[in-house]
UniProtKB/Swiss-Prot annotation:
Location (main, coarse): cytoplasm
Residues bound to (R)-pantoate: 61, 153
Record gene name: panC
Quaternary structure annotation from Swiss-Prot or TrEMBL: Homodimer.
GO biological process entries: pantothenate biosynthetic process
CDD domains in the record: PanC
Enzyme Commission code: 6.3.2.1
Other remarks in the entry: The reaction proceeds by a bi uni uni bi ping pong mechanism.
Protein name stated in the entry: Pantothenate synthetase
Pathway(s) it belongs to: Cofactor biosynthesis; (R)-pantothenate biosynthesis; (R)-pantothenate from (R)-pantoate and beta-alanine: step 1/1
GO-annotated cellular components: cytosol
One GO MF term: pantoate-beta-alanine ligase activity
Keywords recorded for this protein, A-Z: ATP-binding, Cytoplasm, Ligase, Nucleotide-binding, Pantothenate biosynthesis
């Protein structure tokens, strides 16, 4: 595996692969990798001849009061993990490489970015779409793999790729969870032991909502109320949002159907967690 820091070298390696008829699979990350990231890379290994991963803590997707400085980083650990799953190229640029002096161009997807995380984190998705568009242009993958835990991000990136005619298939894979059901996240490391217990309220609330839906409760407002009540029992939980939306448009729904997704963002102590599930998915 090669660790590459400069754009030109990555572009050259990927161009050589394409000219040789190879299929390029790409997994972009912000590092501090967990099993969720590694599962994406294993799937990319199956689907591509050349597997490229990137680690870049993207400053443009963090707000002024968010955790950019404290976001966990451990390149040596991450490099060993990606080597073990068969990554061919690990692209690890610096902020100055991605955003040199005088940088002025940003990518913004309208509509899908106004709700959910976009409402509470203004500018976040502009940073996400900008950096992913740049990475797509650098690597020019045939397929890019993302986790469904970041459901809104996945919808936004699919819209961006379609609207800009980017020749890449954006694939979403199911959320990978800890043994107790908590969605894997690099930010879980910030949870204290007590907060970690309270975070399981998200898992329990999702389960309760799905059980209620399977027993015939199809009013979105009532299901959201059930989830809100369950999470509200935890002393350190602060709800950002809980919504049931159409899985394609992210617009709110009154009554659920097979494409309805329950999405939530909850702060446990100082750690912001997100989770989601199709409400009528098997319990």
């Amino acid at each position: 595996m090669d660790i590459i820091n400069d754009i030109a070298t990555v572009q050259s390696r990927c161009l050589q692969a394409r000219q040789a008829g190879q299929r390029i699979a790409f997994v972009p990350t912000m590092g501090y990798l967990h099993e969720g990231h590694l599962s994406l890379m294993r799937e990319g290994r199956k689907r591509g001849d050349l597997l490229v991963a990137s680690i870049f803590v993207n400053p443009t997707q963090f707000g002024p009061k968010e955790d950019l400085a404290s976001y966990p980083r451990d390149l040596e650990r991450d490099a060993e993990l990606v080597r073990e799953v068969g990554v061919d190229i690990l692209f690890h640029p610096t902020p100055a490489t991605m955003y040199p002096n005088g940088y002025k161009t940003y990518v913004h997807v309208e509509g899908l970015t106004k709700t959910l995380c976009g409402e509470s984190r203004p500018g976040h998705f502009r940073g996400v779409t900008t950096v992913v568009c740049k990475l797509f242009n650098i690597v020019q993958p045939d397929i890019a793999l993302f986790g469904r835990k970041d459901f809104q991000q996945l919808a936004v990136l699919r819209r961006m790729a379609a609207d800009l005619n980017l020749p890449v298939e954006v694939v979403g894979l199911p959320t990978v969870r800890e043994k107790d059901g908590l969605a894997m996240s690099s930010r879980n490391v910030f949870l204290s032991a007590e907060e970690r217990k309270q975070a399981l309220a998200l898992v329990d609330a999702l389960r309760q909502a799905r059980v209620a839906a399977h027993h015939g409760e199809h009013h979105a407002r009532r299901l959201v109320g059930l989830v809100r009540e369950r999470i509200g029992r935890e002393p350190d939980a602060q709800i950002d949002y809980i919504k049931i939306c159409d899985g394609d448009t992210l617009e709110g729904v009154d009554r659920i159907d097979a494409n309805s997704v329950l999405l939530m963002a909850v702060r446990i102590g100082q750690t912001r967690l997100i989770d989601n599930n199709y409400i009528l998915e098997e319990v």
